[in-house]
Amino acid sequence: MKELSPSILSAELSNIKQQLEQVKAAGIKYLHIDVMDGLFVPNITIGQPYIKSLRKLSDLIFDVHLMIEKPERYIESFAEAGADILTIHYEACTHLDRALHQIKDNGMKAGVTINPSTPINILSEVLPIADLVLVMSVNPGFGGQSFIENSVSKLEWLKEVRQKENYNYIIEVDGGVKTSNIEKISNAGAELFVAGSAVFNDKYIKENIDGLYKKIR
């Protein structure tokens, strides 16, 4: 089943309880939470204390994406905060294999991702242990960017390798996803779609979600 993972980066944080209720009522199962440290990417966003507070408000699957240096330092604390999926960057982690196992050992699904300029096949050695592979289709750090077209071939490659090798990872895409391109992205192999401004860009959250789902289901 194809699913959306609305990005909290585009939500109205002062009204987050109501917006979480709205997305769940519209059939959403996942919530994408971007964590940025101001070093790996320019922006600084939320951390473990805020995620812990969100956990009290929602039983959605927390799809947490760490855009931080040396993410292995914080794996246990994000598990304690309530993350269900923890995705880390190849570029930010020296011992990627060990870190992915550490995520699993802390009871979370282990996700791995790369920046748009990094070749997708560089992840070949960790695909057997990954629960999720996230294709960044914009440069990480800011919402509202345009989709990078060469991301389509990365999705196709991941789909082909998974089928050939009988791997089990979920293929996720993040960046520039909207109603005009989500069908093409879905056909390339994506199954989980991070959508920020396409969901939270106005007060019609349910209508936005319905419009996206109609393109992929």
Pin down the residues of each PLM region.
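Conserved N-terminal beta1-alpha1 strand-loop-helix module at the mouth
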Residues: 1-87, 91-95, 102, 110, ...
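Generic enzyme active-site microenvironment
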Residues: 32, 172-173
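Short, electropositive alpha-helical surface patch
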Residues: 83-91, 186-195
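Short, acidic/turn-prone active-site loops that include or flank metal/cofactor-
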Residues: 91-93, 115-117, 138-142, 197-200
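Residue microenvironments linked to proteolytic maturation
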Residues: 106
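Short acidic capping loops at alpha-helix termini that bridge into adjacent secondary structure
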Residues: 168-170
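Glycine-rich beta-strand-to-loop/alpha-helix junction loops that act as flexible
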Residues: 173-176, 194-198
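Acidic, divalent-metal-coordinating active-site segment for phosphoryl/phosphodiester hydrolysis
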Residues: 176-188
